């Protein structure tokens, strides 16, 4: 029997925005997370799972806690010792938004490092979403694992 959950696979980053002097507002965002957020809001009681890899740092723990507080699980997504989430900042020049990214060593790049955990995270899902950005952050071997 097919499951009824919705899952999204990718990288949810720390977002710095709303700069007011030296102060910034921090949140969590990214294409696949934003999509899951909307699907979860529209899907009633369907379980929602964000499939990624996370660090063991305080920001990653805050991210996982934020998901849980909003009814979004992480399945069997691995926690990678010493890893941390990607980060981006939004700056404004007049009405023009600019984005600066720090994501080269983000934990999410390892989301397919454990094929069994990835498969377990995707069990019982009626809908699985990922994006071109998801594929772009993975190396060739990880892309093959994800698409297998």
Language-model features: where?
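Conserved N-terminal subdomain of the carbohydrate kinase-like
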Residues: 16, 47-133
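Short amphipathic alpha-helices and their capping/turn segments at secondary-structure boundaries
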Residues: 1-4, 113-121, 142-148
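Conserved phosphate-coordination/catalytic loops
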Residues: 26-30, 112, 140-141
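Alpha-helix termini
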Residues: 23, 42-43, 84, 117, ...
